Amino acid sequence: MRSTKVIHIVGCHAEGEVGDVIVGGVAPPPGKTVWEQSRFIASDETLRNFVLNEPRGGVFRHVNLLVPPKDPRAQMGFIIMEPADTPPMSGSNSICVSTVLLDSGIIPMQEPVTRMVLEAPGGLIEVEAECRNGKAERISVRNVPSFADRLNASLEVEGLGTITVDTAYGGDSFVIVDAASIGMKIEPGQARELAEIGVKITKAANEQLGFRHPEKDWNHISFCQITEPVTRDGDILTGVNTVAIRPAKLDRSPTGTGCSARMAVLHAKGQMKVGERFIGKSVLGTEFHCRLDKTLELGGKPAISPIISGRAWVTGTSQLMLDPSDPFPSGYRLSDTWPNMPE
């Protein structure tokens, strides 16, 4: 068996969404900050293509690269690679990374609770892991500051007409739309149509509304979050959502950054108060338990500090290799599984 490279991966999923973790075989990319390192990964694309493209990956997969932290307060840094983006932050991926770090012993586990600080490209995140019998059973993450951007904006979408949307940031950027307003219901049997409509809405939102982060070089809307109405039981709000990820797939988890963005919008509209909780439910019925912990400012904008809580499970280990005679060293994409590819 010969190979010019060997990349060691621990497989993981958080509430259904795959977030594998590279634990060896890749040198840290250049950059003075984790954000700069993530921009190198995004522009270079060599690693992204190798681990995400077929035959080694697929559109279903997210992969995280562990890197030494740049901030002395953090125990570990990580860079998130999604099918179409290398984002500032991801809730499900941060839960996967935390679980792999503890379950594999890379960071020593302390039962019943392990606390650590991780450095995502978008900033530091505080992690609290509930641990028992050598397993990180639940991960709570204090997400990066999240904020509402545009509220009740009108958006023209081909085939849908004029719809009303909100835009917000929860560690990544979202256009948020009510499912009923576009004639949809969030259920597994409508996954393909939800994904395709969501990507179409994202494209229209980028063209007509745009987005600009006040501090990071993040100037586009990444995702469409399709929601069903929130219900309230005391100080607990519950809402079903699904997030369409380019090129056209649905997040299997409730999307931690999406829940954070949705809480920011609910707070901006006066529908959620500090200290209240939000249960986000995915298309699979899995849940993230969230809390609006406090308010703050980000670059002069009112923002919230959300906490996301969910579970993740290690699914296996693997080694990705490259035989020097392999005709597809960067892999490949076909439109049967990578929709909306340019012709």
UniProtKB/Swiss-Prot annotation:
Cystine connections: none
Pfam family, one: Pro_racemase
Active site annotation, chain numbering: 90
UniProt keyword list: Isomerase
GO molecular function, one term: trans-L-3-hydroxyproline dehydratase activity
EC number(s) from the headed UniProt entry: 5.1.1.8
Record carries keyword Isomerase: yes
NCBIfam families linked: T3LHypDht
Function, in words: Catalyzes the epimerization of trans-4-hydroxy-L-proline (t4LHyp) to cis-4-hydroxy-D-proline (c4DHyp) in vitro, albeit with low efficiency. The physiological substrate may be different. Displays no proline racemase activity.
Family: Belongs to the proline racemase family.
Protein name: 4-hydroxyproline 2-epimerase 1
Organism: Brucella anthropi (strain ATCC 49188 / DSM 6882 / CCUG 24695 / JCM 21032 / LMG 3331 / NBRC 15819 / NCTC 12168 / Alc 37) (Ochrobactrum anthropi)
